[in-house]
């Protein structure tokens, strides 16, 4: 049979996204859609302007990232180079309770605009991101040349479409802006029944505008302060539209000051809460970046770790048995802090870095004994969440020096340096910074020895938990943070670690998780599969070479092995380079 097509991808191993075994064949594309997929090429080349010989490569549906914050930066990085060049053709934005709307006279657009917020309202410990719209826009005009004028999710979607984007964007509504727009700064309490009713109006409007669900971030303000009844009430509105309730469950507790003697919540209770929202609201649930939620002591005991993971997954399975559609997502590489890598060691002392104004100046100041003692007093008080030995007593064991002008420190943890010198770990940290304020570190990682059990669960999916950016992104006030490695190579790490090297999943099962399983979860029709009539979101990948090139020292490197990427039939990545094409769409609720 002859097919009129624009693009022909031939001789590849077709991995169609359904879980079926790969086979050698071809894919033909006309305009936005796939017109043929088959074992025999035949006359598919008729009219094809682009012919790709995929001999020795896998041809898969485009990858769908189900846990992402790309909506907060897509207007600033519309090509989303970091996503497309690792094969992400569709991202689900609006996670962890944050979305770009609704807002009225105050706006909050997340930590992707950290420099702007810091200029407007300098902070020492915790940034203020809910600010007056006029003041925000004055600074925004100065930095970017345009203003933020949208107020609703519908308006924001139109803004994104008007500017164009390379990937597809699946919008979720965040719980944070709903609470902000109704309660403003008076959010550290349960909402009144009248306030909940007002929130429901905003939820309904967002769902009518095309959102595919609502997210909450229970470890962050203002979601942290919501009652269970509020969550159920809002999720019930989302359920009316067939939407998804995505939940960063309560695990750490509020990520702000934690005084000595104040204990974090029992992590598993946060998962139970999310699943119970699903039961009460009769809604599909997505658990964000799930991990083992039972603490194991001593660490490293494989049998105990497996038992804890089984107990965590049993809660998921029990909810599924009760009729709740439950999925969960995993971050491929868990080094760093979600959206950022913070590989300058000095970032551990960020409040004092801000005061000093530069890494060099803080390095000099740390030579003062009195200054050190003041810093240690604050740290031990629990005022600074990100370095709090009261809640993370093993922090020094997990911080390894990877680069320093002082060779004696390289490839040692802060704990090892402290032991060698017979000093407190905090003093060891400061000694390393004094020796080289530009010293680089890499987290030892939090990769669970039982993560394979999560990958093998049929409800698991993948999300890189990062912003849509390119290699130019860095904070400037002062420079202390860089993007996460996952911003550039998370999916490449997934296929290397889970398929080629780890052999945890077969290629077809690994592909299914990030394509048809993810599409089904969020109701993406004709996405996530290679079949006639489906949208032409396609990745051509060399499974023998696919791997991240990003490292803790240099996270801003694109991966190897992702050769070609198509979005809605547009050739966005060609020979591993972004073409500049912007064929992406906002995938509204249908």
Show which residues each predicted segment covers.
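C-terminal cap of metal-dependent C-N hydrolases
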Residues: 12, 368, 453-459, 464-472, ...
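Histidine-rich, glycine-flanked metal-binding segment
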Residues: 2-8, 14-62, 77, 548
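Active-site neighborhoods of metal-dependent hydrolases
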Residues: 156-160, 165-185, 190-193, 199-221, ...
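Acidic, glycine-enriched loop/beta-strand segments at the rims
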Residues: 14-26, 440-451, 502-511, 519-556
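Divalent metal-binding pocket/active-site signature
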Residues: 208-270
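Divalent-metal coordination cores built from histidine and acidic residues
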Residues: 57, 76-212, 242-243, 324
């Amino acid at each position: 049979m002859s097919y009129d097509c624009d693009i022909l991808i031939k001789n590849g191993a077709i991995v169609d996204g359904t879980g079926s075994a790969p086979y050698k064949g071809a894919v033909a594309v006309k305009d936005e859609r796939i017109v043929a997929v088959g074992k025999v090429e035949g006359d598919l080349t008729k009219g094809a302007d682009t012919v790709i010989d995929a001999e020795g490569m896998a041809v898969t549906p485009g990858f769908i990232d189900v846990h992402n914050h790309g909506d907060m930066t897509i207007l600033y990085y519309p090509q989303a180079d970091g996503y497309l060049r690792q094969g992400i053709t569709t991202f689900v934005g609006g996670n962890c309770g944050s979305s770009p709307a609704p807002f009225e006279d105050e706006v909050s657009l997340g930590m992707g605009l950290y420099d702007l917020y810091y200029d407007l309202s300098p902070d020492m410990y915790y940034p203020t991101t809910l600010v007056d719209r006029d003041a925000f826009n004055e600074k925004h005009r100065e930095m970017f040349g345009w203003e933020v004028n949208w107020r609703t999710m519908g308006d924001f979607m139109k803004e994104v479409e008007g500017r164009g984007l390379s990937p597809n964007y699946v919008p979720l509504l965040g719980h944070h802006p709903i609470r902000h727009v109704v309660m403003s700064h008076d959010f550290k309490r349960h909402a009144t029944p009248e306030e909940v009713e007002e929130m429901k109006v905003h939820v309904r409007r967002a769902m009518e505008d095309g959102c595919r669900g609502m997210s909450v971030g229970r470890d962050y303000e203002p979601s942290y302060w919501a009652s269970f009844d509020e969550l159920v009430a809002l999720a019930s509105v989302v359920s009316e539209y067939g939407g998804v309730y995505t939940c960063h469950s309560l695990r750490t507790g509020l990520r702000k000051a934690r005084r000595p003697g104040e204990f974090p919540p029992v992590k598993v209770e946060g998962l139970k809460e999310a699943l119970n929202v699903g039961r009460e609201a009769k809604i599909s649930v997505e658990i964000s970046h799930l991990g083992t939620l039972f603490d194991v002591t001593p660490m490293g005991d494989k049998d105990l770790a497996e038992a804890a993971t089984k107990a965590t997954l049993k809660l998921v399975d029990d909810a599924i048995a009760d009729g709740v559609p439950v999925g969960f997502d995993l971050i491929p590489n868990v080094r760093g802090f979600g959206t950022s890598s913070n590989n300058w060691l000095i970032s551990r002392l960020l409040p004092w870095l801000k005061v000093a104004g530069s890494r060099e100046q803080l390095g000099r100041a740390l030579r003062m004994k009195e200054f050190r003692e003041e810093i240690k007093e604050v740290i031990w008080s629990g005022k600074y969440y990100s370095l709090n030995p009261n809640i993370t007593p093993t922090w020094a064991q997990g911080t390894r020096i990877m680069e320093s002008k002082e060779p004696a420190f390289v490839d040692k943890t802060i704990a090892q340096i402290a032991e060698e010198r017979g000093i407190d770990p905090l003093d060891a940290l400061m000694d390393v910074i004094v020796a080289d304020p530009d010293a680089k570190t890499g987290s030892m990682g939090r990769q669970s020895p039982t993560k394979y059990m999560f990958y093998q669960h049929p409800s698991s999916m993948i999300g890189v938990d990062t912003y849509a950016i390119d290699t130019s992104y860095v904070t400037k006030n002062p420079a202390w943070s860089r993007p996460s490695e996952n911003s550039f190579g998370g999916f490449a790490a997934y296929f290397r670690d889970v398929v080629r090297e780890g052999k945890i999943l077969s290629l077809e099962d690994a592909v299914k998780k990030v394509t048809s399983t993810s599409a089904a979860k969020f109701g993406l029709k004709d996405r996530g599969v290679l079949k006639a009539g489906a949208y032409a979101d396609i990745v051509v990948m060399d499974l023998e070479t696919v791997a991240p090139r990003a490292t803790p020292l240099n996270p801003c490197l694109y991966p190897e092995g992702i050769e070609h990427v198509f979005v809605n039939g547009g050739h966005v990545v060609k020979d591993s380079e972004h073409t500049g094409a912007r064929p992406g769409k906002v995938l509204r609720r249908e």
